[in-house]
Amino acid sequence: VTTIAFDPYSDAQRDDPYPAYAEARRHSPVTKLPNGDYAVARYEDVSYVLRHPELFSSTAMMRAMTNVFGSAEGAAKLTPSELARIAQLMERMPKLGEMMAARNMIASDPPVHGPMRNLVNRGFTPRRMAHLETRVREIARASLAEIERKPEFDIVSDFFVPLPVTVIAELLGVEHERKEDFKHWSDCAVAGATGGAGAMGPVDVVEGFTGLSQYLTEIVEKRRRDPQDDLISTLIRAEEGETALTPLEVVMFVSVLLVAGNETTTNLLGNTLIALMQHPDELARVRRDPDRIPAVVEEGLRYDGPIQFLFRQARQDVELAGVKIPAGAIVLPLLGSANRDDAQFPHADRFDPSRNTQGHLAFGLGIHFCLGASLARLEARIALEELLPRFAAFERVEPHVKYVDSYLVRGPKRLPLRAQTSL
């Protein structure tokens, strides 16, 4: 087994992970990391991991959702006041441990996974997506109307954040007026998956999760008394039997959907706009021909996707690319690396919306293929359709992009622009 330096907390890895991915694909397609995990870099092997839940369990995804302290060493560094604050928060949420252990779709395997996915699928039907198109466009236009009044604006906080937050809030049936809270809670979830990397520490993460859980618990109770035409009510009305969800499971489900429903689209749009600005010929081409926007979105997903990897756990001893992975080991299928594999996508480091992107892994593969993929594609397409004609040109205010403090999620933390409005 080859061990290479792979530090997910390093600025270099966070700001540009692709050179390290390329090195891994060439020299160590399955790499044992310093912490004992195994990173899988090539498209063929990543696909294999995702296609075989009988060998690689998704229950390891709970690690991404609960890795608040990063490690035992990280927890040991907490001050007495921080430990006291966390204990105080835990007292306010006596069922927090039970909630984190509740069934949820992204961290489950067959036979539990299928019925749960079918249940949530009811909120993402083609009919509902078609109905959403008009509403997504209304939200996009309202945000852009505000932006037009500003000489400079942060396209992330002013447009790429509020659009998906508002959409997923309305779909779930929560108050989109609290979108700033939702974004903060999502940021806490992302920070939790980084082990408290960056500016947000473990206390912030626990406070955020506690706030989200308390809010959603109240909403679920309201929907039990007064059902509405929304996804939370659909989950509560689940038919009796194996699929029926407990109140805590509904809260956990909605927490996951709320976070995933806005982080994915926000970062997809941020990364794709950066790629277009770095490739002015492509930007000019899509301005001339808006019908190219769906292809731009797909290439954005492949070229610089919002989720860099997933977590799996080996159910048994398994050999992959000549490397023996022991039962119980955590395995990281690197989606971002697989999508840059020349063996699958020739000249993969080139941003080329004309290429065949079929088979990219930005939304995963197999039974855990992202349930909200159609919604993310819809939001991204409409956002670009409304954004690009409105401004004749963009100019970056800051020369360097600051990315979110996460190795799991990739996207610009902010992207201040100076734009010239189209006449």
What does each model-found stretch correspond to?
Residues V1-L423:
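Cytochrome P450
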